Amino acid sequence: MTGAVFNKERHIKYYLRCLKTFLPDLYTANDSNRMLLAFFTIAGLDVLGVLQEKTTPEERQGYIEWIYHCQVPTGGFRGFTGTDFGQERRTPENAVWDPASIPSTFFAMVILVTLGDDLSRVKRSECLRWLPRLQRADGSFGDILGPGGEIEGGRDLRFCCFAAGTRYILRGRRGQGLEDVKDIDVPRLVSFIEACQVRAANFLPMSPVHPID
């Protein structure tokens, strides 16, 4: 029996289709998750070692501009541009309908770094002030801030990963120059992650279980 063979050229062709032409129709329902789709497409080409070869500097700059167009003025990134009211029409009342999300923010950061951007246009302080507002009392993180600043969605380890990754990219190990910006509660986050560990030495994706004896 012949083993499976990785078809690199076919993968490259698929990613380029997603990047430069219309997305497959099965992705239509995921329009609000375009940042996620962009991440997997660009990261896929980068992992295959052809991102620089198969895209021009002008194209890569265009992708960077699209990412920044998804940046929310109060910090973080939205999943796509469809909820953007524009600077003149955005108000504290309607901002709840155009929220930044933790996954989109993390993916935006990684895409920008992959494309060679210096992150100088990222609203660093605003994003780092927004991040702790999404942390729950148990240490986990939500997805977005809803009406009244209520934390919505998330709660599992994926969102913990997105939050920690975003924090590291923007704050670094020491947080130099950001001493006046409130940090997330790292000990609580660690406790939540540890509480998700089960006796089989794996981690449950959702809520914590009883601590290991």
Which residues fall in each region the model found?
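Preference for long, amphipathic alpha-helical scaffolds in soluble/luminal domains
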Residues: 1-213
